[in-house]
Structure formats: C-alpha cells, structure tokens
C-alpha cells in the first residue's frame, strides 16, 4: 500500500508538472500573440499610405477595400469610420519632430480651415479614450475656436489650463489627436494628402 501511494503520488505530481508546463507555454504564446498583434498595428500606423509630417491617414478607411490590418486599426482607435466621401480621418501620434505626444509636455496645434463642411480636432489618451477633465472639454471644432485676424487658430494641448483654445492633456502616458473632416470637398476626397493640416509643435516638458 505504501509503495502504491508513492507511485500514485509520483504520477499526480508528474501530471501536475506537465499541466503547469502546458499552461506556461500557453501563456507565453498568448502574450507573444497579443504583443505581435499590437506591434503590427503600431507599425501599420507608422507606414500608412498617406503621411503629412505628424499626421497619418488612408483613403481606404471606411471602404470595402480596407484590409484586415486597416480594419483592426479602425476598431482599435474607435473611429467608426465612414467612407472618404462622407468623412476623412487624420491621426497624429507624434509632433513635428516625430516624437510621441506625451502627457507631461505642452504643444501648440497651429492651423487653418480644412476644405470640408465640418471639421473637428479631438484629443485621446494612449488607450484611445477621451481624456477626463473638469471642463468636459474633449475637442474643438471649426465654429468654437478662437482665431486671429487671418482666420487661423492655435490650440494649446497641455495639463495646465490656458486662457483660450485649451485642450487638456492626460495625467500621464502618451496621447493622440484625431482630425475629422466631414463632407470634404471632392478634390480633397480624391487626394486626401492635399489637405493643409495643422502643425504640432512641442513648447516644453515638465
């Protein structure tokens, strides 16, 4: 009986060891799979079809011709994309120098109108959620921006409040901007890289 108990215990321990090994391999495989998927999507944002300094876009967003990577990117960033004749989407994850947009840094977004019936600029945190703030201010659009005598605007993207055109940054991490242009002019819809997009200049960091 004692020998049988020892043998049985050894078998149980061996099965448990194999089970833990299997679970360990499965966990590593899952982590590698998720990590590689995120890397592919992040790489995709850096190699989009259209790139204008800090901004990236694609004429295939919202179309039946979008491949699985573009569809995954749209789902990840929650664009709820329409076709290019209805809306164009420009995303910025970096400033003019190619550096990631960081919460601890201040930026000035300087630009003019986009040829569209309506356009807006929205800030998101690194998880692509709206940034919580006491003013419930998440974006600016073409009608509520304070402009200079030439019709241009300057949005202040920072944690510290500004007197006007202030868009709050998150407390930590990276962030991004999305410019949406609804009912774009036909010429822009056919050549989305022709838009004069705003510059994103870093003015300092904490």
Please report, for each region that a protein language model flagged, where it lies by residue.
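A compositional/structural signature for long, glycine/proline-rich flexible linkers
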Residues: 7-206
